[in-house]
Amino acid sequence: NLTEFPRPILRKICVDPFDPSDPCSIMLSLSFSLWRYHSCFVISRKNNHNYFLLGKTYFASDFHLGVDGRLSSAERERQLVRWLETIRHDADAIYLVGDIFDFWFEYKTAVPRGYVRLLGKLAELRDAGVVLHLFTGNHDMWMFDYLQKELDTPIYREPVIHKIGDKTFFIGHGDGLGPGDHGYKLLKKVFANRLCQWLFARLHPNFGIGLANFFSNKSREANHSEDVFLGPDKEWLLQYSTRKSEQMPKVDYFIFGHRHLPINYLLPNCYTRYINLGEWVHFNSYAVFDGQELKLAFFEHPEGKAVEG
């Protein structure tokens, strides 16, 4: 029974790529083919290899490190490290779905200072075999290849579809999706333009990062009522998920961040769920999938509550 193996050995077996020239690898692959029908597994692709994963999959977004909230940014970072430490015993995949930082820009030879505790913990988890998926958000879309190389992890700039166990997940940060918000959609194209990125890189980091933080704070002040559920007719990511579910009926979960409100909502097809991960500035919310069911949960925030529908 493979579930009786020590977990570090299982993780090593599952993370190593399949080698068709290795008889041991072939035997393990056949064993897993029989066993996976009786346990949770994930198949993901990296560098054209198939990986088998065991255990739980975690999703979180919108840490917005660099700005204070219910806790200071430094205290929130330590809290995130505690959360990662508590889930490391059963986490085989972690999706960080955008806006990890309130602002991030990678110069050719410099990155924003700070965040060493979080980055160190993520590196530790990667070295232990935990699969990590990073997404850019609207606050850290200028994340290039630094974290990709240092953490040996993919960075997604658009939504992706991943199969986890026997469930299909549509995952993305959520910015620029759905109806309306044409001003931001235009601005996003400007920010994604290579010429604009080159021009910003010409600014001294002290000035460029300070300017970006100023506009980030202004944007937050203009969206201070984000924690109010607007109803299915006005929640644009819910509307987007509803339309997408009609085009992609095999998707079980649409998972987004960006909205800053934990939401678990059943779509009109009575099968697919729209999940918003909330944020960590106030809610400390995240989602966990155990192979059968996905739930929203709260870390060190017992009064946290999600919008259910």
Task: Please report, for each region that a protein language model flagged, where it lies by residue.
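Structural motif
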Residues: 164-165, 289
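Active-site-proximal loop/helix segment associated with metal-binding centers of metalloenzymes
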Residues: 174-236
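Conserved beta-sheet core of the metallophosphoesterase superfamily
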Residues: 150, 154-157, 170, 175, ...
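Active-site environment of divalent metal-dependent phosphoester hydrolases
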Residues: 66-68, 102-105, 134-145, 177-179, ...
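Short, low-complexity, charge-dense intrinsically disordered segments
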Residues: 1-9, 14-46
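Core catalytic region of metal-dependent phosphoesterases/phosphodiesterases
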Residues: 51, 55-56, 60, 65-164
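Conserved catalytic motifs of the protein kinase core domain
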Residues: 56, 93, 167, 252, ...
